């Protein structure tokens, strides 16, 4: 049974288009997500530092409770 040349060409074209799609930087959201996670972690760390500098006792505890999940998410994403 002979396979038509058009089928070979179609398989090669589909394979190449798929590999080119993965090679584009738009298909890689990891760098964008990493930059966003880093910016979020830095902003939350600044918010925690500001809250710790204030004399009210409840705010540092509240700030730590809010910031810790973001720091955990950043560290797991970076080193996990």
Swiss-Prot record:
It is found in: Secreted. Expressed by the venom gland. Keywords: Amidation, Ion channel impairing toxin, Secreted, Signal, Toxin, Voltage-gated sodium channel impairing toxin. GO terms for cellular component: extracellular region. The keyword Iron does not apply. The modification Phenylalanine amide is found at residue 79. The keyword 4Fe-4S does not apply. Residues 24-57 form a propeptide. Vertebrate-selective toxin that causes pain by targeting voltage-gated sodium channels. This is Myrmicitoxin(1)-Pr1a. It comes from Pogonomyrmex rugosus (Desert harvester ant).
